């Protein structure tokens, strides 16, 4: 059995895509990454992702974290620039020894 919820309207499309992955017995990590990337990629959301508000130097800096519930491994990034989907980097880092990156 699986479940996935969204608490903000901006996540509905991503949750729908993730639900399809889970219904087809896909990987939960893939489903979560898909859901988050859908939000990160939408330019009209000003609090997160591609459309995020810039810092005082007028640069958009993004943060993300990922945790694998089976292994409890984590990955995180902070203040990265020029990359559309920080959740993908965080997920990849969860598989490495050094799981935290800044900038």
Model-identified regions with their sequence ranges:
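Alpha/propeptide regions of enzymes that mature by internal proteolysis
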Residues: 1-103
């Amino acid at each position: 059995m699986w479940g996935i919820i969204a608490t903000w309207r901006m996540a509905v499309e991503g949750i729908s895509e993730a639900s399809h992955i889970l219904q087809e017995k896909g990987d939960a990590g893939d489903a979560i990454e898909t859901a988050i990337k859908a939000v990160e990629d939408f330019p009209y959301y000003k609090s997160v992702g591609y459309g995020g508000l810039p810092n005082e130097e007028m640069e958009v800096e993004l943060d993300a974290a990922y945790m694998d519930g089976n292994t409890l491994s984590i990955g995180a990034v902070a203040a990265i620039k020029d990359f559309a989907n920080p959740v993908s980097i965080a997920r990849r880092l969860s598989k490495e020894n050094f799981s935290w990156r800044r900038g």
